[in-house]
């Protein structure tokens, strides 16, 4: 008798007890949603929910399409400035990131991710060399070599592409106003 009384008082409400949640007799397979439009409520019943264990090919292919992102192709000028900024400092302040992004026409997220990837590459280069050779990977050693300068991110075939570095970039310290000179 007590169960009948409690069930009658809960008819308009949802019970969150474990027994009620796991009871298959209380699950009817539909969901009710309410949409408020012009201060008027109208209940809508959606189609029965699908079995989560059933394969859903349409959703799987849609998820692959959504996760596919176009890779950013940086120009040589953008890479020069990004590399020069990285040689100056391996970590950017919010202000520096904003200045570089606006000067290069990139989003701050693109600049941030480029720096993260470049730091990862730099750390791998440090780990790959012995103690004596680590000094060759230091920022000062790289900036003192005006002949060749490696482009980041071209590691698909394990080939490193080089381009000659212009010497006037070497003596320019990072400053937001100097970015436009590059």
UniProtKB/Swiss-Prot annotation:
Name the InterPro entries for this protein.
HD (IPR001356), HD_metazoa (IPR020479), Homeobox_CS (IPR017970), Homeobox_NK-like (IPR050394), Homeodomain-like_sf (IPR009057), HTH_motif (IPR000047)
Q: Which UniProt keywords apply?
A: Developmental protein, DNA-binding, Homeobox, Neurogenesis, Nucleus, Repressor, Transcription, Transcription regulation
Q: Where is the composition biased (Basic and acidic residues)?
A: 29-43
Asked whether the UniProt record includes Nucleus among its keywords, one would answer: yes
> Cellular component per GO?
nucleus
User: Where is this gene product found?
Assistant: Nucleus
Q: Disruption effect? A: Morpholino knockdown of the protein results in impaired neurogenesis in posterior regions. Expression of the neural precursor marker ngn1 is reduced at the one- to three-somite stage. At later stages, there is a significant reduction in islet1-expressing primary motoneurons and defective axon outgrowth from motoneurons. Formation of Rohon-Beard neurons is initially abnormal but later recovers. Development of secondary neurons is not affected.
Q: Which residues bind DNA?
A: 67-126
Low complexity composition bias: residue spans: 52-63
Q: Which terms does the record give in the GO molecular function aspect? A: DNA-binding transcription factor activity, RNA polymerase II-specific; RNA polymerase II cis-regulatory region sequence-specific DNA binding
Coiled-coil residues are: none
Region named Disordered: 24-63
In the record, biological process GO terms are: cell differentiation; negative regulation of DNA-templated transcription; nervous system development; regulation of neurogenesis; regulation of transcription by RNA polymerase II
Q: Chief subcellular site?
A: nucleus
Q: Which PROSITE patterns match?
A: HOMEOBOX_1, HOMEOBOX_2
- The segment annotated Important for interaction with tle3a runs over 1-34
Subunit and interaction comment: Interacts with tle3a.
Matching entries from PANTHER family are given as: HOMEOBOX PROTEIN NKX (PTHR24340), HOMEOBOX PROTEIN PNX (PTHR24340:SF106)
**What does the function comment of this entry state?**
Transcriptional repressor. Activity as a repressor is enhanced by binding to the corepressor tle3a.
Family assignment?
A: Belongs to the NK-1 homeobox family.
Put simply, this protein is called Homeobox protein pnx
Gene giving rise to this polypeptide: pnx
